[in-house]
């Protein structure tokens, strides 16, 4: 069967940052161009300015036939193309959209294969002969923004400036209404071109995108996903198409309160400082004049100053700093994000990205960021029904919130998950029970830990009791320690809730109690190295997880195969030899009225490049060219390797990423958890359920006649053929909103 490749270029008054579905649903959104190609044929283009030209008619016919015949249709970012087809295609061109099952996504193939999920970066990464046209982004900025071109051009003829601005506001797209002469010129990318030249370049850019996308897909064809992973991609399309239902009327009310509170805080800040809160440089200078000890106003510095040097600020300085902190409360920004992303029917679509996490394949979230919604405190959680009733009745205001509950931003952020609801209906809210703590011992074959679950023990409570902390802390400590986290990994997320001494104690206690897990860290690291040294063969880390190193096209890579048969891909892997060294020095401890004592203080383990012998390590220290100088003597050293691969670093940046045994075990554990969740969601769909929300080990579904919570849980817990004896269990509830922690 042939495959068609397609790329849309569109225009809209809606901001694309509101998500593809919200953008496409806007009545102003129209298709400007689309390029389509069958297999290896040259792309043909439909264009809005010449819809009846032979080429446009051919492109339209090809698209109609592909849809009618059920032929696979490939695009780089199917989330966008599917949304445009859902809302715009029939409205503008009279064509019913393709079935979701027809879509194939090259961006998903990039994510699954370890390549960058950007067409330009993927083409560069794969060293293709065809590259994305770099001027394209600038051309999109001109032709897709319905006001941009008018901004770039001077008023035409004797039209007055005020009339030109009116034309800009009311015209759907000036170039399409023949309101701008084709021979006018504008500045772009350091040069000038006429509107006609720009439009022709835009059409060429659209053609080229199809060519480059097709080449990326061809290059990655040897890494095509398995049928199960493809089924997961199609499930993800259906789930995103269903959308997450949100209470838009209540969101609007809270958004109004947030804006009012922001205005109030900004007014107070101006009264104290004479500045707007957004004037960061001026605000820093003002605060320094009132005792602020930091050198910037970034979140980390401000938090450090408030913790250590707050008393150095005078009264006005403290008030101003507190207001800036309140205004920067990030969690409350989910409310406007949910408003912006909501489609006209009150559903947020396209918020989940399948295979968004490179090292696990887990879903990630964009827009409202559902995966990190603020967890309400116990006190607030009990009050949520009351607060929500006041909100629905229109009786909530910032003054009342402050008096009854505290900081309005804190309260509104705590409400964010409760806006996920279907008016007049209930939803299923289900998550797997202690799933990571179950998967890890199952992967490494540790029956001792698995027996605890079979006996119904709460492993997080066991850790909490051993350390004298609550269950939440026990869970955090357990999850961090089991993946080779050191005391800092425990201390940082828990902050003031745990001391450094207790964090060290927790790590030592976990490692002593779980030698099988500690051994597995080394086994996973060693298996990576064995695979690198012996390419083309599979090397077992455990009975459930194995590694292989492939040097074949499209790039060298380590594959970590999970129980489901799915591979986590690590491009351009390496294992660099290093020496781990520990140092000590004597510290004199003086206590008033007592004889001074000498205490030995040890460093944490530090790394040195290369495999060094004791004499080389000592020589390195003696050179005095490193941070190691303050230490007096070496107390231990051993040789190991530092593992690295090429991957996602942060935001849109890609580069060298370091990994290690515990991190690999974490990827295997969380990746297997995702496979369980995906398998369960697909099974739930087969039983007639409609999952619309997934986060890590949690899923939400609609309640409807003929469906039950028990059946939804049973479907999610269906044991797959690739792990039939796994002790999978889940907890769930039925409520009017998303509530589960």
Place the predicted regions along the sequence by residue:
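Conserved pre-motif C helix in the palm subdomain of viral-like polymerases
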Residues: 208-214, 433, 662-682
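A short acidic-Thr-Gly-centered motif at the start of a beta-strand
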Residues: 1-2, 63-67, 410-426, 682-687
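Conserved "right-hand" nucleotidyltransferase catalytic core of DNA-directed polymerases
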Residues: 1-9, 14, 114, 129-134, ...
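Active-site-proximal helix-loop-helix substrate-binding element of RNase H-like nuclease domains
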Residues: 29-31, 36, 40-64, 68-217, ...
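Short active-site loop/helix that positions an aromatic residue
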Residues: 79-92, 113, 284-289, 433-448, ...
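Gly/Thr-rich phosphate-binding beta-strand-loop-beta motif of the actin/hexokinase/Hsp70
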Residues: 2-37
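A common structural junction motif
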Residues: 716-724
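Short, conserved charged micro-motifs
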Residues: 706-712
């Amino acid at each position: 069967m042939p495959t068609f490749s397609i790329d849309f270029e569109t225009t809209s008054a809606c901001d694309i940052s509101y998500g593809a579905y919200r953008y496409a649903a806007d009545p102003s959104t129209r298709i400007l161009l689309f390029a389509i190609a069958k297999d290896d044929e040259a792309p043909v283009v439909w264009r809005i300015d010449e819809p009846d030209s032979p080429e446009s008619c051919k492109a339209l016919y090809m698209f109609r036939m592909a849809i009618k015949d059920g032929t696979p249709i490939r695009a780089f970012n199917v989330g966008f193309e599917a949304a445009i087809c859902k809302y715009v295609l029939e409205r503008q061109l009279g064509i019913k959209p393709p079935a979701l099952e027809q879509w194939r996504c090259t961006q998903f193939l990039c994510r699954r294969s370890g390549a960058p999920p950007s067409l330009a970066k993927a083409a560069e990464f794969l060293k293709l002969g065809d590259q994305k046209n770099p001027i394209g982004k600038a051309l999109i900025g001109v032709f897709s923004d319905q006001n941009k071109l008018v901004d770039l051009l001077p008023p035409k003829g004797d039209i007055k400036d005020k009339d030109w601005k009116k034309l800009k506001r009311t015209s759907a797209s000036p170039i399409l209404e023949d309101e701008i002469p084709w021979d006018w010129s504008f500045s772009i990318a350091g040069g000038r071109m006429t509107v006609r030249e720009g439009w022709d370049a835009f059409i060429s850019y659209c053609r080229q995108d199809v060519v480059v996308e097709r080449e990326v897909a061809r290059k990655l064809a040897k890494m095509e996903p398995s049928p199960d992973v493809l089924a997961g991609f199609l499930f993800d399309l259906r789930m995103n198409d269903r959308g997450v239902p949100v209470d838009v009327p209540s969101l609007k009310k809270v958004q109004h309160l947030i804006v009012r509170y922001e205005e109030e805080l900004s007014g107070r800040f101006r009264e104290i400082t004479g500045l707007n809160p957004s004037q960061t440089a001026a605000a820093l200078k003002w605060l320094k004049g009132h005792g602020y000890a930091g050198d910037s106003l970034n979140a980390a510095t401000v938090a450090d100053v408030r913790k250590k040097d707050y008393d150095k600020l005078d009264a006005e300085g403290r008030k101003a700093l507190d207001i800036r902190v309140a205004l920067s409360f990030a969690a409350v920004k989910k409310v406007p994000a949910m408003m912006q992303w909501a489609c006209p029917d009150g559903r947020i679509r396209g918020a989940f990205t399948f295979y968004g996490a490179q090292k696990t394949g887990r879903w990630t979230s964009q827009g409202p960021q559902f995966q990190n919604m603020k967890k309400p405190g116990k006190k607030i959680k009990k009050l949520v029904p009351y607060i929500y009733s006041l909100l629905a009745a229109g009786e909530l205001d910032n003054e009342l919130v402050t008096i009854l509950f505290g900081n309005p931003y804190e309260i509104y952020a705590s409400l964010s998950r409760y806006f996920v609801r279907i008016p007049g209906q209930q939803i299923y809210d289900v998550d797997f029970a202690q799933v990571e703590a179950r998967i890890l011992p199952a992967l490494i074959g540790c029956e001792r830990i698995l027996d605890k679950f079979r006996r119904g023990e709460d492993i997080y409570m066991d850790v909490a009791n051993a350390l004298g902390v609550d269950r939440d802390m026990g869970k955090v400590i357990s999850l961090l320690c089991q993946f080779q986290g050191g005391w800092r990994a425990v201390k940082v997320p828990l902050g003031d809730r745990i001391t450094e001494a207790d964090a060290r104690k927790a790590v030592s206690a976990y490692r002593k109690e779980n030698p099988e897990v500690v051994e597995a860290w080394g086994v996973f690291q060693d298996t990576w190295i064995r695979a690198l040294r012996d390419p083309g063969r599979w090397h077992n880390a455990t009975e459930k997880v194995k590694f292989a190193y492939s040097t074949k096209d499209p790039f060298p890579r380590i594959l970590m195969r999970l129980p489901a048969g799915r591979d986590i891909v690590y491009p351009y892997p390496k294992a660099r030899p290093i020496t781990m060294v520990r140092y000590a020095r004597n510290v004199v401890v003086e206590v008033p009225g007592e004889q001074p004592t000498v205490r030995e203080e040890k460093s944490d383990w530090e790394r040195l490049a290369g495999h060094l012998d004791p004499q080389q390590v000592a020589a390195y220290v003696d050179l005095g060219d490193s941070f190691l100088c303050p230490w007096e003597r070496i107390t231990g050293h051993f040789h190991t390797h530092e593992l690295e691969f090429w991957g996602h670093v942060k935001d849109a940046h890609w580069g060298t990423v370091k990994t290690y045994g515990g991190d690999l075990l974490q990827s295997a554990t969380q990746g297997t958890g995702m496979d369980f969740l995906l398998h369960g969601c697909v099974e739930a769909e087969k039983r007639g359920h409609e999952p619309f929300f997934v986060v890590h080990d949690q899923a939400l579904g609609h309640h409807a006649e003929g469906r039950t919570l028990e059946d939804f849980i049973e479907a999610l817990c269906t044991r797959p053929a690739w792990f039939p004896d796994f002790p999978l269990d889940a907890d769930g509830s039925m409520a009017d909103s998303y509530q589960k922690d």
